[in-house]
Amino acid sequence: MNRRTFLKSTAALGAASVATPFIAHGAAREIIIAEPVHSTGYLPMYVAIANGYFAEADVTVKILTIETGAGHTNAVLSGQAFAFIGGPEHNAFARAKGAELRAVVHCVDRGNVYYCAAKGQEPTGTDWGAYLKGKSLAVSQFGGTPNSITRYLLKKWKLDAKSDVTLVEVANSAVLAVVKSKQAQIGVSTEPFVTQGVRQSVWAEPFFNVPKELGPYAYSTLNVRLDSIQKDPELVRAFVRGMVKGLKFTYAQPDAAADIAKKQFPTMPLEDLKATLDRSFKDELWSKDGTISRAAWDTGSAVVRDAGILKSDVKYDEIIDMSFVESVRTSL
């Protein structure tokens, strides 16, 4: 049984008994974090788990991978998971439906999205509207952040997402296969899939680098229910503290972080993993201290609003709570 199957099966077995977002065993607690894809982009979170930063507060963290557009968010709303990692725009979507979620610590501070052209389809200039018109783009499912960024950029480039291009919306991990099978000429992808596609000669190096083009971006934050903050702030604080320590360790000791990545992605060739991590460090993918800046949400908000996915202007303080990051910062 592979890791993902194990996680899904154990989560399913435990679903009936998980009425609250954590399970208490005396002083120890076990919490589940839902992720939309198992990605090197979330390395600081895996580092925090591997290094025992959550365990320092008697918290055990398990990862549940749910590859549907809003599945990771729904896992938190239903109480199956304590937190999800993903864009805080999902908190805004939930708020529009009457639910209250809060982003409490940052992870990915850049839009972890790269546009790659299939071999033989590479652009010759930088007029992206003219280049992309008439092409098929493989991208994550509607509601996922890569999909939102794509719709935002298409509008910026004066292209209609329905009539000027074809969006082949699939799971994040399936984008590479779609381009490889020639169902799309463009792959909208993240690491480690970008490097894998380059190594397999499916596509060339990215022609459009979102981390560099859009700058600070609230791309992947750790998000919890508001009632978790209200009912058990110490658990939230312990979780935030562990994440901040994971972020700091990743930047301070990249070689040691890479060793943890090897264990998380054991089937990935080492040269692919190295190239993936090199790109992530070069693009300053991760937050350095867990802070979600107002500028980062301004960009994230603009993306989902201009893409037509979020209809209302949701303010920073309505979906983001930095009080826990601020409270642990002085002690780290």
Pin down the residues of each PLM region.
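Short, solvent-exposed loop/beta-turn-alpha elements that line the ligand-binding surface or hinge
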Residues: E56, A130, P211-E213, K282-S293
